[in-house]
Amino acid sequence: EFHQRVREAAAEGADFIKIMTTGLLDFRNNGETTGTPLDKAEVKEMVHIAHEEGFAVMSHTNGIYGTQAAIEAGVDTLEHGNYMDEETLTMLADSHTVWVPTLVTVRNLLGCGRYEDEALLPIIHQAEEMVRTAFRMGVKTALGSDAGAYCVLHGDGICQEYQSFREILGDSKEVQDWLRNGEEIIRKKFRRS
């Protein structure tokens, strides 16, 4: 069925395939996601099919198991990637996958009343530490906002995401070059042949 969907996407002129290998963040239980992550073999097969059809693959993924499965499968971008550990970041650094943290999807929820700030802060702090570690390790990373998510407006989201990186890492040329490199990799990978 997935192969047929990918062929339909190609016929309709799609530019890439986005898969969802894990659920959403569970804001009531820090460190957990909703639902059950897809099996590693299933993720690998999905990525293989999409790549064979000439598509780059974005993967909505959170949690250690899910992120490791996506990286091992060869996804082109890892969207979100919350709750990773240092081992997973090392795998990411050694791979061809670009991480797109989408920090504002959680940061913009602070003070909005939808979730308790006390539940959001540990997620935010862990994500900030992952960004620092990723920078130090040379993980290929790019900006992305997940625009359209709750409190993430189109247009504003990417500016807020860049500001988040500046707050975490500073605004040095090294940080700018790091993010630019990740973006350039994405631009090359996501050109349909």
Model-derived features with residue positions:
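Metal-coordinating catalytic core of metallo-dependent amide/deamination hydrolases
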Residues: E1-D117
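Charged helix-capping and loop-helix junction motifs
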Residues: T33-E42, L121-E128, G157-E161
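His/Asp/Glu-enriched, well-ordered alpha-helical/loop segment
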Residues: E52, Y115, H125-S193
